[in-house]
């Protein structure tokens, strides 16, 4: 179903911390892909599974996953509905069993690239309180209710 990305490894960002902090600020809202990522992270910090799920779109995420497996299945409404439900259930279980710890994490958005019509990948560099940096490639979709975060993709999927 969903692509599982290995735990992010520490990186050395191309920009200095001073340069990262000088990047334009992003509003925490669903008006931009980056804002949707910030909404998701804020919901993680509050440990609110309902707020987290409101930042995502499981129908779109599940359909993208089906397209990667079998295009015919992705066009079957019953299969898409069932897959969306299963994707959401699995996500809720995984998150509530192991909430991401984003306390004190700084987020910097360094790139946005087109992925497909209505989809972009937002590259986020996170700096943890211990000074380590990690890179995250968020697949984000423009939906009827604004931008929604789907899942992370690997660098290999972007090439």
For each feature predicted by the language model, list its residue ranges.
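Short beta-strand segments enriched in hydrophobic/aromatic residues
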Residues: 44, 56, 125-127
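Hydrophobic beta-strand residues in large extracellular and virion-surface proteins
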Residues: 37-40, 107, 121-125, 139-140, ...
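Surface-exposed, charged secondary-structure patches
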Residues: 25-29, 33, 61-133
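Solenoid-repeat scaffolds in large eukaryotic assemblies
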Residues: 51-53
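Short, low-complexity N-terminal intrinsically disordered segments enriched in polar/charged residues
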Residues: 1-49, 58-62
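Short beta-strand edge/turn micro-motifs at domain boundaries
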Residues: 1-23, 130-159
